[in-house]
Amino acid sequence: MESKKVLNFYKALANLKEIEAKEPPYDTVTETGMVALYEICFEQAWKAMKDRLEFSGYAEQKLGSPRAVIKLAYQVNLLADEQLWLDALQARNNVAHSYNEQIALGIIADSRSKFIVMFEALKREIEENWV
């Protein structure tokens, strides 16, 4: 049985993939929605990782921040590419500046080109090895 946090991540990923199917040029509402859904998906992803790590017996005190979760998840092979996840964390942190259209478009481009694939790889890894 998958936890609520894992299921929330799967739903967030499905929502992100749905909006990412839209082609540019984007209107402001679509652009804002894409950035917001990226942020939500990232949040749900790291919380799902934390949930699976705790379920597998890793100490909660080692899992306080997204960065700590990413680093431990990489060490135990839940993630294949630590730097990509750290880049995704930085993009999530940049969401606060997404009123700047260049930052927003950068987040959207990275989401489309690499972060969705990254999220899908996490989903597969959880389903295959961390349930």
Regions of interest found by a model, annotated:
Residues 1-131:
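Solvent-exposed interaction patches of small proteins and small membrane subunits
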